[in-house]
Amino acid sequence: GGNDLLQFSNTDKDKFRSKIDNLYYKKAKKLEIPMLGICYGATFVANKFNTKFSKKKKVGYHKINFLKNSFFNPKNKVLEVNSFKNYSINKLNNKIEILGTHKDKTVEAFFISKIKFLGLMWHPERYNKFRKIDFDLIKKLI
């Protein structure tokens, strides 16, 4: 984690990360393995689908709202999530299902059924205890 997309940062570290992630992405896609992208991983894959980003640094905690959709429909529609990002997702390709958004309309969670990809813009692994809602969401992928 902690990297930015090459269109925003062209450091050697980011170039290396992008190269490695492209290899993993292509392999998983070819083998039809479900994929989970967290923060950078979500933006990395979303970027392959003509996504619009904005420089909106979000660090700390904020609430997101889950939308009613076919992939994930929790009883509690509001979730507080952590955030450690420099860029936000403004607009996704219409073939991508938006699962949750921030009050500023940026996308916080999405699903790409064609490649079985779940993108989360928060870090479920950074909580002291793994939360049930995060577990349920990830479990839907597999």
Predicted regions and their residues:
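Pocket-forming structural segment of enzyme catalytic cores
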Residues: 22-26, 31, 47-109, 124-130
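Glycine-rich nucleophile elbow surrounding the catalytic serine of serine-hydrolase chemistry
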Residues: 38-46
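Acyltransferase
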Residues: 120-142
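Flexible gly/pro-rich beta->alpha loop and the following alpha-helix that scaffold active-site loops
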Residues: 1-36, 49, 139
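Short, surface-exposed beta-strand/loop micro-motifs that present aromatic residues
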Residues: 106-114, 118
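Active-site metal-binding loops of divalent metal-dependent hydrolases
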Residues: 2-3, 42, 124
